[in-house]
C-alpha cells in the first residue's frame, strides 16, 4: 500500500518540446550550434533513418541518439556548452504562454516543479536554472573534454519518464501531482498524475488547488 499523503505542496511535471516550449528544441539546437555545411554532411550519413523517421516508421526515441551522435560526436564540450547556454536564454521567448502562466501559478504557491524531457541537458540545465525549477532529462556523455556523441542515460521518453521520476520523487509525499504533456511519449508520466493536461486534446488547463485543497 502507498503511504498516506502528508506533504503540503503539489508536484508539477512539464514536458518541454511542444508543451512548455512551442518549438522542437532538440532540432533547433542543432541548427543553432552547428554550421549548415556540417549538418548537411553529417545528415547525409544517416539520411535513410531521417527519411524513415519522417515517414513515421522509425521512432523518435531511436532517432534522437542517432542524430545526436552524427552531429556532435567529437565536438569540444566547452564550445558546445557555451552555445547551449546562449540557446537556453533564447528559449525563454519560445514558451507556450498559457503553459508558462500555469507554471508560474505553481511556482507562486511553492509547488515543486520539474521539467521532464527527452531533450538535452546541455541547454535544459541552464534553462531550468533561469526559471529556478528542477530537471529530469536525457544526459550527454563527455570524456576528456569531448562529447562522445552518446547519451549517459537512456533517452528520457515514455517509460523512462516514469522510471526516473519515481526514482527521484516520492509521489505519495505530495498533496497532488499535476502533469502536462503533448504526445504519446508523455503518457506514462501523465498516468502518474491526479490532474493531467494533454496539449491539443484538453481544452482547459486544470485548476490548481492550494495545499489546503482550495483553488490557488
Predicted regions and their residues:
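Metal-dependent phosphoesterase signature
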Residues: 63-98
Amino acid at each position: 500500500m502507498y503511504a498516506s499523503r502528508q506533504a503540503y505542496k503539489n508536484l508539477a511535471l512539464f514536458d518541454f518540446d511542444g508543451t512548455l516550449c512551442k518549438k522542437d528544441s532538440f532540432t533547433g539546437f542543432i541548427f543553432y550550434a552547428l554550421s549548415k555545411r556540417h549538418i548537411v554532411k553529417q545528415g547525409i550519413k544517416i539520411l535513410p533513418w531521417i527519411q524513415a523517421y519522417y515517414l513515421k516508421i522509425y521512432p523518435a526515441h531511436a532517432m534522437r541518439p542517432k542524430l545526436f551522435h552524427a552531429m556532435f560526436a567529437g565536438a569540444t564540450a566547452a564550445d558546445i556548452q557555451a552555445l547551449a547556454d546562449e540557446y537556453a536564454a533564447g528559449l525563454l521567448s519560445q514558451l507556450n504562454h498559457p503553459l508558462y502562466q500555469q507554471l508560474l501559478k505553481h511556482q507562486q504557491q511553492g509547488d515543486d516543479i520539474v521539467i521532464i524531457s527527452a531533450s538535452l541537458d546541455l541547454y535544459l540545465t541552464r534553462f531550468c536554472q533561469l526559471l529556478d525549477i528542477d530537471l529530469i532529462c536525457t544526459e550527454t556523455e563527455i570524456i576528456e573534454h569531448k562529447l562522445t556523441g552518446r547519451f549517459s542515460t537512456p533517452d528520457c521518453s515514455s517509460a523512462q519518464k516514469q522510471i526516473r521520476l519515481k526514482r527521484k520523487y516520492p509521489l505519495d509525499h505530495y498533496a497532488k501531482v499535476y502533469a502536462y504533456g503533448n504526445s504519446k511519449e508523455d503518457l506514462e508520466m501523465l498516468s502518474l498524475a491526479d490532474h493531467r493536461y494533454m496539449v491539443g486534446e484538453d481544452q482547459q488547463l486544470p485548476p490548481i488547488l492550494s495545499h489546503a485543497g482550495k483553488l490557488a
